């Protein structure tokens, strides 16, 4: 009968750790879109109405004759003028200095008095701490995107979202936008600035060889996961 030779437990643990590190290196960085809601919405079917016998039908597409054509219903479109310019700077510093000094003169007694007149005890200590830190960030995003009204809130505000895709030289670029728009901020040209949109989420991403060139290789991720520094 053949005897099965088992690997030592230390070797098994090392092999498992190496395999786990290799799998971690092969794993891709998760990329979840920040815009989670649907990119478009279809308006509900209009209720069938009896023809009134006139040229103007008040129920046609929900568009009143003597009111502006601003979006107000699900499925209407709106142009978002993206004009984001954010600059942030932060700096901090701390400095602490503490010093202490103690001196005792103790008279000696008994036979020690002939050897030492006094016993001197002294102690000194110094504690210093200094730290500085700073951070700065600058982001600029300009462009336009047309979105669709996906929901109308009870107070009349419009929940909008939309997506724009561009295929340029085998590189697919995505621009996604979502937020809540107050109809009073919509201009006569049926547009609104992104700075006037509440809960705005703007996403710009791409897929293609350019995006792959910016991704760290699996061997680099492997050594990055096991490096102790």
From Swiss-Prot:
GO terms for molecular function: cytoskeletal motor activity. It is a lipid-anchor. This is Flagellar L-ring protein. Assembles around the rod to form the L-ring and probably protects the motor/basal body from shearing forces during rotation. It comes from Burkholderia multivorans (strain ATCC 17616 / 249). GO terms for cellular component: bacterial-type flagellum basal body, distal rod, L ring; cell outer membrane. A lipid is attached at residue 26 (N-palmitoyl cysteine). The basal body constitutes a major portion of the flagellar organelle and consists of four rings (L,P,S, and M) mounted on a central rod.
């Amino acid at each position: 009968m053949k005897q099965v030779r088992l690997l030592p437990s230390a070797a098994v643990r090392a092999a498992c750790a190496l395999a786990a590190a290799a799998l971690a290196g092969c794993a891709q960085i998760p990329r979840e879109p920040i815009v989670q809601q649907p990119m478009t919405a279809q308006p509900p079917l209009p209720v069938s109405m009896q023809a009134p016998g006139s040229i103007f039908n008040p129920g046609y597409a929900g568009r009143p004759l003597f009111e502006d054509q601003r979006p107000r219903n699900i499925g209407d479109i709106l142009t978002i003028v993206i004009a984001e310019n954010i600059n942030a700077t932060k700096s901090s510093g701390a400095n602490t200095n503490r010093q202490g000094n103690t001196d005792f003169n103790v008279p000696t007694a008994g036979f020690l008095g002939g050897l030492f007149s006094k016993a001197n005890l002294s102690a000194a200590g110094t504690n210093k701490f200094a730290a500085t830190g700073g951070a700065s960030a600058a982001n600029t995003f300009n462009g336009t995107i047309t979105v669709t009204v996906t929901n109308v809130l009870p107070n009349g505000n419009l929940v909008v979202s939309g997506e724009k895709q561009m295929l340029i030289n085998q590189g697919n670029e995505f621009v996604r936008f979502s937020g809540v728009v107050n109809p009073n901020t919509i201009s006569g040209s049926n547009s609104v600035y992104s700075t006037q949109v509440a809960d705005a989420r703007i996403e710009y991403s791409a897929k293609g060889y350019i995006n792959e060139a910016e991704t760290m290789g699996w061997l680099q991720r492997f050594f990055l996961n096991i490096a102790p520094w």
